[in-house]
């Protein structure tokens, strides 16, 4: 799997409470032509084991505004329990679905409970 730093949402981002990804990806100006294409490959994984929290749910969100005032969730995981959130765990969203219309894309991590440790890495990748 190959990460491009300009296409990363999170690089070892600590999650102790609900938060948006550190980075937002700008898909470009309106009326762009990025081809018919296919789903965009996405990797979201645990880079350091979580402790303290109850669960995490990951959502892919899009918006026409970089501030995400009217974010639309296009796909999300179920709530993943703490017992599964060990280093190496991969969340079950493997791509950004086709037809995402907003200019900006980010991830949102919904944390239940109070986390004391744990990090995620996420981004658009080649070679999953």
Sequence positions of predicted segments:
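Surface-exposed, low-hydrophobicity beta-strand/loop segments enriched in small/polar/acidic residues
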Residues: 1-128
């Amino acid at each position: 799997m190959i990460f491009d730093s300009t296409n990363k949402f999170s690089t070892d981002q600590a999650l102790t409470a609900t938060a948006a990804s550190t980075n937002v990806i700008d898909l470009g100006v309106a009326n762009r032509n990025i081809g018919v294409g296919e789903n965009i490959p996405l990797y979201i994984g645990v880079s350091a084991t979580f402790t303290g929290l109850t669960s995490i749910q990951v959502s892919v969100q899009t918006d026409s505004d970089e501030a995400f005032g009217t974010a639309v969730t296009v796909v999300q995981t179920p709530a993943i329990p703490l017992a599964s959130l060990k280093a190496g765990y991969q969340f079950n969203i493997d791509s950004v679905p086709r037809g995402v219309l907003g200019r900006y894309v980010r991830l949102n991590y919904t944390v239940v409970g109070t986390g004391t440790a744990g990090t995620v890495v996420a981004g658009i990748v080649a070679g999953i």
